[in-house]
């Protein structure tokens, strides 16, 4: 068989990290995407957890390894290990708590300090089901995403609105960058660039057009 496969289960393994303040719904976004579950009584994550899910993009099996950690300051000591090898991030805020949106820029700086500055970032305004409590307008968040070169969606982990779309879009953009670099390198097939487990994928591609504001909201 032409090309390299990391193993029989997938063509690519991409590490994504969930970041944002505590209580914005990161763990429920993860459980909704990977298990289609939602826990109304979920407590803040202690330490680090990760879950995996495979999906098909352009007839390639993409395995997403998605890491979740608590947003409280006392867990910030794990940042270096948490971010290492990440090729994508979902930066989550709570649309009903403006302070969580205000902290997005700090999270973004920390992310870019610990990863390739061209990492694919999806800004997520979660809890869009609480329409009567919205404190961050869609237009305000769109403006930030446009300025920072982020993708943007509003989601509801409770109602499963846009959750699948947000993860899939982020993974698709990562795949496009990696496969484009493989083609430009003259590889016979995109699978030849699939990394062994644990190997970091360098997604830096200053000539690509992915880093443009992409918008989808509920």
From Swiss-Prot:
Q: Which GO terms describe its biological process?
A: protein transport
Q: Where does GTP bind?
A: 20-27, 68-72, 126-129
Q: Where is this region: Disordered?
A: 186-205
The protein's GO terms of the molecular function aspect are: GTP binding; GTPase activity
Q: Which Gene3D superfamilies match?
A: P-loop containing nucleotide triphosphate hydrolases (3.40.50.300)
State the species of origin. Answer: Nicotiana plumbaginifolia
Q: In which tissues is it expressed?
A: Its expression is weak in leaves, higher in stems and roots, but highest in petals, stigma and stamens.
Record key words, sorted = Cell membrane, GTP-binding, Lipoprotein, Membrane, Nucleotide-binding, Prenylation, Protein transport, Transport
Location of the protein in the cell: Cell membrane
Q: How does it sit in the membrane?
A: Lipid-anchor
User: One matching Pfam family, short form?
Assistant: Ras
Give the record's GO CC terms: plasma membrane
Please report the name of this protein according to its UniProt entry.
Ras-related protein YPT3
Primary location: membrane
What family does this chain come from, according to its entry?
Belongs to the small GTPase superfamily. Rab family.
Q: What biological function has been recorded for the protein in this entry? A: Protein transport. Probably involved in vesicular traffic.
What PANTHER family does the entry give? DRAB11-RELATED
Domain of life where this protein originates: Eukaryota
| Covalent lipid sites (S-geranylgeranyl cysteine) | 215-216
Q: Which InterPro entries match?
A: P-loop_NTPase, Rab_GTPases_membrane_traffic, Small_GTP-bd, Small_GTPase
């Amino acid at each position: 068989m032409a090309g390299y496969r990391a193993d029989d289960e997938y063509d690519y393994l991409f590490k994504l990290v969930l970041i944002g303040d505590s209580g914005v719904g990161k763990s429920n976004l993860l459980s909704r995407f990977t298990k289609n579950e939602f826990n109304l009584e979920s407590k803040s994550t202690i330490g680090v957890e990760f879950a995996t899910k495979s999906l098909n993009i352009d007839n390639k099996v993409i395995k997403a390894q998605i890491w979740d950690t608590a947003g409280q300051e006392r867990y910030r000591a794990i940042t270096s290990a948490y971010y290492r090898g990440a090729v994508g991030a979902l930066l989550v805020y709570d649309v009903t708590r403006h302070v969580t949106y205000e902290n997005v820029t700090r999270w973004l700086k920390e992310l870019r300090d610990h990863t390739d500055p061209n990492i694919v970032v999806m800004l997520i305004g979660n809890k869009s089901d609480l329409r009567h409590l919205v404190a961050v307008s869609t237009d305000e968040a769109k403006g930030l995403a446009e300025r920072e070169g982020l993708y943007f969606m509003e989601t509801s982990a409770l109602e499963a609105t846009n959750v699948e779309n947000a993860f899939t879009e982020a993974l698709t953009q990562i795949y496009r960058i990696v496969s484009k670099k493989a083609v430009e390198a003259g590889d016979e097939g995109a699978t030849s660039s699939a990394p062994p487990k644990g190997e970091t994928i360098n997604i830096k591609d200053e000539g690509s057009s992915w880093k443009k504001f992409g918008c989808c909201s509920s």
